[in-house]
Amino acid sequence: MLERTGAEREHTPEILARATAWFDASSESARSRLLANIMAGLPGAYERYDVPGLKAALARYHGIGKADLRQNFMRFLAAVIPTAEEVGINMCVHPNDPPRPSFGLPRIVSNAEDIALILDAASSRSNGLTLCSGSLGAGADNDVPAIAGRFAERIHFAHLRNVAKESDGSFMEADHLGGDTDMVAVVTILLRAQKRRLEEGRRLRSKRSPPTVTDRLRLVCEISRTPAAPAS
């Protein structure tokens, strides 16, 4: 579809064979729909790319590998986190979505190892994590509850999503209790971390901050007229 140089080296022979079979059997309208979906909502795009525009954007990153991208991010943290500490801001990096190379671009926030490297690079509370259970859950080897537990004290924001994965690596958004991630375990870990912070006297949010996990659960319970369960 994109005729991107080197794309065939990034996929297994089985996926390439399936893609070729689909392309040969598909209509022009089906191909146009697929291309529109590929171009919709790409990261870093304020407007929808066309094929030449996407290729031009990708060309800017030619020769930049995972180590280069990670080193650049570490330089960013070294420059920004001290100021964040001074003014009381909690930075929180969002995991890559999907958590694997995309369009030939490397990923540096895809799993527990990546997260540990980032948080250790600036061992400050201001250098934290957005726990997106959907992004991390799309990785076949990611144990999202384990990641939540390991980095609980550095999680400053959470995107509570769930996804269902297929054997070929495809994934789709799922109901909160209908995907592959144990969302009850994830929420339990977050509530326990929130309780610890309250007991330590830590300020969880300012007046303008988004609601906490407990706030959201309480709202759901009020809507359903069910008493909210205490955090434990």
Where are the regions that the model predicts?
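Extended, charge-rich helix/loop segments that form flexible
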Residues: M1-R70
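Histidine-acidic metal/acid-base catalytic patches
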Residues: E14-L16, S27, D50-G65, M74-N90, ...
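Residue-level "edge-of-site" marker
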Residues: D97
